[in-house]
């Protein structure tokens, strides 16, 4: 069910599926085998094999990284690396020679570095780098990082395995497979990716917390860890498993050098400021370039010597271990393992890693020409009784220059056995220039331990699983070269009394359960390696002696298993990063689609109301025009009707005037003739004047009546139009209110919908994180089970060896003790021969009882060891389960906090939106009321203009529509 949900989360719709893309720096139309010739295999990385290739035309060498990809999505995972390599042209960064995608395989051709990786060089030479060599590497790495960070690129996987060497003594920064190329200068990342031991604290936190992203300062932390790795061969906390080291990085103080006194103050100060847990105060690469530790570097001679030594011709000579006299040396050379256990527990080292793998170094007789001197200071200090006391290199780790013990953990690595017993002697012979101090100072003799593992570094150079040695902390500076060379030879000439040391040695081995050196020395061999090389005309010869045993194969196997474990974790990281990228892409697409849909919905709603308003205005205009037309028609008809009536009235009025004239005539005719003429004349004049006055008054009254009728008609039309305009404005404002209300409702709905989508996306993101975390936890449990199984098998094998070896030891010891007892009886001469035989018989019976007790003690010890181992394995699993549960609980708790914070943020946004909505509503109402007032003002002004007296020829106007209708 969970997997189905996981598939659902990452599923894209049909139109969202990506098609094949053409990339700028990847050729698809060319078979790389036609251009390059494969010469051999260089190594096997986490995502594919690396081959040495040669260009068929130019003869240029390249490292071909061949990766099988199943889909375009997988191909895109490597495009970032190709683009970074293609755009980074820097002398200390590997160059891209070409990239091909052909037949389902991606070929990345990069610059070939014959010197190999720095971690492989340390394995080959059985030692770390000297401080001058570290200075040059650090300087060149800082210049490369400054260039990368200037291009907004975060490497995210800095370590010695990703620093390649050229024969000219320059480095090449490689492996950009997990690098990030930002689009903005201040952009930060939240991907949990990289190799655990080198991760910065802010990167570790991103495993469960994505809200605390990191930037390019994470590379500065990895640089500091890499410098410690080059000084001590292994990174800090290498003895812990990857899950525990993540907690260690996040909760502990920044790591430091195990033996700070062996290194300069500049180096220690550089590490102190580079390994700052606060990324805000951590310096940048440009600032670190001004530090005194690297600012004085002007030559790469130290690295040229290093590469020359690593690539030098090696002559090996194997000598069988001697049985005679070696047992005595072994007794005095073996340190008490109890001290090791105490040192380990005091420093918090895992008991499961220390219970059966205590470091034991045995000494090798030195040539007579070399003086026998202590190793690293007070190695052979006289004990209280005057007898010499030898200290192994493992004990030297926990002592300072004054011989006092300091809390330094044993140099071991889970889950690798480090029982290898190594003694290294270096002899340098300078033939051309015998007084060349620089060459001698740069390669001081070392006392080495077996390197537990190679930290599983997938590099583009040669990955060598050499039987290298682990240098004790501190590649010496010139100030310490004399002390280091004086301590390079461990004296083995002193021996203890055989009779007293034999039983002590046996009891020590039986008590601790460790392998007896007397038995193991019979099978050990001494490997002598002589390297001869020339640097600047100076021939240098270095001879290294190392005791090899069957544990070498065990160490190599453990180293390989550790590489496999880290490779599995890195594959999980890569897949997790791919899933996170796909999910982020899907979420961005969902948000983009949602915003686009929101815009479309809002635009559609606005368009709907705009169309409604437009229709309303058009209808209003049409209605007003129709009303004006109707008004014009009514005016004409009314005017015509009134004129007709007035014409009839006028005709009647004329008739009345005629009657009046006739009456005047009749009244005049009754008068005398003489008077009649005078009266006729005066009556006609009076009648004419009266007629004119009456006619004028009648016409004026008719005109006034017509004007009053037209004004009344116009006023009625104006009132109708005003009512229509008011009604239209009210409808328009109601539409505007509905429009704004709909938009506000959509905005609120969109806020809710966006919140739900973001909330669901957050849940999907945490679901994916839980899914990836559970897969990682399952892989860690699987690795822990394999580790516990290996520990059980190793314990069983060791117990079987001890059980088989005990009878031989008892027989030899019994013969020796019997001979010594008989010799003591003979010397003392006590009693007769029969008494002596009786004493011998009693002594023999006591020896049988003692040997039987030893066998029972060994059996009990083996049972206790097995019980302790089972308990330890269960404790390891329980501790791992507890840590995983805490991490899951932390992830769930963080998810709850994020969801709560998201809800609170949404509620706050909704509250702010509602607070802003009130003034928006108020502004809308004010605007609508203002438009109403403006309309009423316009109506009033129009009415006043209509009532003002006008000239007879001037037509009254109310609206522009009626201007042509006044007639």
From Swiss-Prot:
Q: So what EC number does this one have?
A: 2.7.11.1
| Coiled-coil regions, chain positions | none
Q: Which residues are modified to Phosphoserine? A: 13, 20, 191, 438, 450, 454, 485, 514, 549
Its recorded name reads: Serine/threonine-protein kinase 10
Subcellular localization, per the record? Cell membrane
Enzyme superclass (EC) = transferase
Q: How is its activity regulated?
A: Inhibited by the pyrrole-indolinone inhibitor SU11274 (K00593): intercalates between the ATP-binding Lys-65 and alpha-C glutamate (Glu-81), resulting in a partial disordering of the lysine side chain. Also specifically inhibited by erlotinib. Slightly inhibited by gefitinib.
Q: Which reaction does it catalyse?
A: L-seryl-[protein] + ATP = O-phospho-L-seryl-[protein] + ADP + H(+); L-threonyl-[protein] + ATP = O-phospho-L-threonyl-[protein] + ADP + H(+)
Q: Does the keyword Cell wall biogenesis/degradation apply?
A: no
- Superkingdom of this entry's organism? Eukaryota
Say which species the protein is native to: Rattus norvegicus
Chain positions found as Phosphothreonine: 185, 951
Q: Where is the composition biased (Basic and acidic residues)?
A: 835-866, 902-947
